[in-house]
C-alpha cells in the first residue's frame, strides 16, 4: 500500500509528522506538503504558474518534499510527479484545528483530500479539535502557545487505515473527514453528518484603533481603499444530535463523516 500525506499547515508542522508516524508501519509513505502555512485557502490550484519542489526532512529526519503552492498543488505534485505510481490513499493532516460543518469547503486540509478524489484517489482529511480551555499553555513570559496532543488522533487514524487496508475503501464514499478531540470523554468513533455551520464570521475596520488594538493587526500602508480584516468567533454550540459538531462538543469523541465530491442536490424535481 502506498500513501501520500499532505496538509495545509506546512511541511514542518507537527501534525504531518504525527500522521506519518501513525501509518508508517502500514504502508510506504511519501510526504509532499506546502512549504508554508496555507490554512483556509480551500481548493486553490496554481494553474500555469511556477512551482518550486524541494527535498527536505521532517523533525524525525525522515525525507519529505515541500512545494511552493497550495495544499491541492502539493497533492497534485505528489501524485503526478513525485511518486512513481499513483498512491492508493491520500491523507491530509493532521490539521492543527477543527474542520467540521459545511465550512469545510474553505479548509485547505479537506480540499487537499477533495483534490485527491478528483485524481481518482480515495482520501482522508484528519483534524485535531483543540479545546481552548485545555490546549493552550502559558510560558514563563506569560505568552500563550498551543500544546498539541496527537495521541488519540494517531491511534484513530492508524486503526482506520488498517481497516481500509484489510477491507478496502467503502463503496459510495469518496473521502472521509475525521476530527479527533484532544480533550475527550470517549475514544469511540461516531459516524456523523455535517453540521450547517461552525463559526460566525465578521469583518472589522482595521483603522479602528480600539479594534485593531484588540486584534493587533498591523496596518497595510500600501493598500488603497478600506483596510479590512476578516475574523471568526463564537464556535456554534447548538449542533443537532448525529452531527460532527455534536460528537466533538457534546459527546467529546472522534467524528467520522463520509463525503462525496459530487455536490449535486437530488431533491429538486421541478421548479
Where in this protein do the model-derived segments appear?
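A cross-family phosphate/adenosyl-ligand binding-site feature
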Residues: 3, 14-81, 85-86
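Short, glycine-rich nucleotide/cofactor-binding loops
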Residues: 5-12, 103-104
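Short glycine-rich anion-binding loops that position phosphate/pyrophosphate groups of nucleotides
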Residues: 9, 37, 70-71, 95-98, ...
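Hydrophobic/aromatic beta-strand patches that form the interior of the parallel beta-sheet core
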Residues: 30-32, 65, 91, 122-126, ...
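Internal, conserved structured core segments that host functional sites
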Residues: 77, 85-139
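Phosphate/ribose-phosphate-bearing ligand recognition and processing surfaces
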Residues: 118-166
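C-terminal accessory domains and tails appended to enzymatic cores
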Residues: 146-148, 167-271
